[in-house]
From Swiss-Prot:
UniProt keyword Nucleus present: no
Keyword line: Amidation, Amphibian defense peptide, Hormone, Neuropeptide, Pyrrolidone carboxylic acid, Secreted, Signal
Modified sites of kind Pyrrolidone carboxylic acid: Q74
GO cellular component, one term: extracellular region
Compartments where found: Secreted
Family membership noted in the UniProt record: Belongs to the gastrin/cholecystokinin family.
UniProt GO MF annotations: hormone activity
Name this polypeptide is given: Prolevitide
One GO BP: defense response
Signal peptide extent: 1-20
Tissue: Expressed by the skin glands.
Length: 88
């Protein structure tokens, strides 16, 4: 009886051990593809980030200049700076 249980457990351990290890051929191919895709994805992400940063700066700069010009035209810059000088 114990011999049968021992053989059953031994067989289960051997099967589980061999199933846990993937074949080396398939694993190497997957790793190579993952590295290739991961490399391209990070480069694309960095490039898109730089483009977005430059684009946002280009969009925001004219708005700032327009706001400053309108504030100067309305005479608000002098009042705003004088209030800051008095507070400081």
């Amino acid at each position: 009886m114990y011999k049968g249980i021992f053989l059953c457990v031994l067989f289960a351990v051997i099967c589980a051990n061999s199933l846990a290890k993937p074949s080396s051929d398939a694993d190497e191919d997957n790793d190579e593809v993952e590295r290739y895709v991961r490399g391209w994805a990070s480069k694309i992400g960095q490039t898109l980030g730089k483009i977005a940063k430059v684009g946002l700066q280009g969009l925001m700069q004219p708005k700032r200049e327009a706001m400053l010009r309108s504030a100067e035209a309305q005479g608000m810059i002098g009042t705003l700076t004088s209030k800051r000088i008095k507070q400081g």
